[in-house]
From Swiss-Prot:
This is V-type proton ATPase catalytic subunit A. The gene is ATP6V1A. Belongs to the ATPase alpha/beta chains family. CDD domains: ATP-synt_V_A-type_alpha_C (cd18111), ATP-synt_V_A-type_alpha_N (cd18119), V_A-ATPase_A (cd01134). It is found in: Cytoplasm; Cytoplasm, Cytosol; Cytoplasmic vesicle, Secretory vesicle; Cytoplasmic vesicle, Clathrin-coated vesicle membrane. It catalyses: ATP + H2O + 4 H(+)(in) = ADP + phosphate + 5 H(+)(out). ATP hydrolysis occurs at the interface between the nucleotide-binding domains of subunits A and B. ATP hydrolysis triggers a conformational change in the subunits D and F, which induces a shift of subunit d. The c-ring is subsequently rotated and results in a continuous proton translocation across the membrane. HAMAP family: ATP_synth_A_arch. The modification Phosphothreonine is found at T136.
Amino acid sequence: MDFSKLPKILDEDKESTFGYVHGVSGPVVTACDMAGAAMYELVRVGHSELVGEIIRLEGDMATIQVYEETSGVSVGDPVLRTGKPLSVELGPGIMGAIFDGIQRPLSDISSQTQSIYIPRGVNVSALSRDVKWEFTPSKNLRVGSHITGGDIYGIVNENSLIKHRIMLPPRNRGTVTYIAPPGNYDTSDVVLELEFEGVKEKFSMVQVWPVRQVRPVTEKLPANHPLLTGQRVLDALFPCVQGGTTAIPGAFGCGKTVISQSLSKYSNSDVIIYVGCGERVNEMSEVLRDFPELTMEVDGKVESIMKRTALVANTSNMPVAAREASIYTGITLSEYFRDMGYHVSMMANSTSRWAEALREISGRLAEMPADSGYPAYLGARLASFYERAGRVKCLGNPEREGSVTIVGAVSPPGGDFSDPVTSATLGIVQVFWGLDKKLAQRKHFPSVNWLISYSKYMRALDEYYDKHFTEFVPLRTKAKEILQEEEDLAEIVQLVGKASLAETDKITLEVAKLIKDDFLQQNGYTPYDRFCPFYKTVGMLSNMIAFYDLARRAVETTAQSDNKITWSIIREHMGEILYKLSSMKFKDPVKDGEAKIKADYAQLLEDVQNAFRSLED
């Protein structure tokens, strides 16, 4: 296969910007004659023009981490400096695409090379220059208007789900001297021309942004709207907000990937950026296979989920260094859509692999290792990544709000949560969904351990719940109490058996079992249970807690009388009711609809109350 006809880099070809390779150690290359280079500057190494980034400067020597396989690079090979940092292209064409860690479009490379492998040093622009997009300028913008960074000056309907708002890059401003009329343009055509202090500047629909730099915002806002995931255990007990940070640590086979994929499929976000960094390739191929087939209903129209998703896939034949780049590429894409006023969710699967890449690079640079060989700055790197989440007031006009929610999967070796990456992550994130190996072995999925998980957003969401689901907060508190009590009783039951427990404790055990098996457990592969809307979650919990309260009251009020009501009597008389309670989850929100499900649950509550009345009479 002849790769020589593929495009090469076109940035700068001046002889003065060349250095020379001095030494090669895996993905780390040292180069000399690099005086005047900057930290994190993008370079091209060797005759194949491999992409690299400067990570250390000493005198005229530069240490470069290379994002491609370095075999064949020899001492004395040229190192071309590009004079700019590692950046991504932001513009129409991102949605539905799949990029590698340094934003090379994998499908375009595949069609150009006719090969399943990525050739080294390939240089394909991230956003296709051949596709024409229909550009509509903003109504209130004309020649002579003043415009500043972040202002929306046009709209491109990227697909039926995403209106791509074309914004002025944050650092530019000026007076409009030309704006393109409505029509079809490709991403290299000039659609806007500004004049500022006598200097004219032309803009296309694409802006370039350095990945390590946070995109500016007007102000950060407190997050107060829940990120509804469709998973009952997460929405009810450990909610996350739009603009929050979440960690999902869990051992191999606990279901981290299924949770992050179901978040991508069913959460109430407008845009999903899914970063697979260093995980197994079959997980990314599963995403690629499933997502185009998955649909969601928007205003009565069925749409493919891929239309609101961009994938950043670190292919397995890329060296470890690229894992770091893929995390930054993903978060920069997320911030760009946030600036348009969208609510974005970014899934990073898995941040442990990224930390391992940091460890390897740090080892090759001979830095002092800290805990488990990870570098001492691991916590700071993780924090700088998670801090880019949040709900914000976006820069520019018209006024708009956007948010970035980060969900990071962590894979501690052997499921050990005291691992440095897990403990550093838990110090930063606000929501912790801890997955339990024992639950996974019992086939209880999602295997979120309700005793060790927590969410620090409970208070922030109280206002939302009071407004929309007034009865929910006390229900959640009661459910947590029941689950905690059941855990305390489990030890006693093992010693003395169930029979010798108090009647109220027997009720607690049975209702806890009901909550665990028929509320917290959820089968992600069935049409009725793969996604649970919040009204259904509240309805189910409400009926279970109502049964618990009525059963306890019946037992306590008749404890002193002659015809005592015990748990065995309740169970005998209410087999039908218990069966109905445990089969509440089989209502299909798509087929049955909200009104019918709510009516059925209300009817069941009435049946429960009537059954207890007749029992007491």
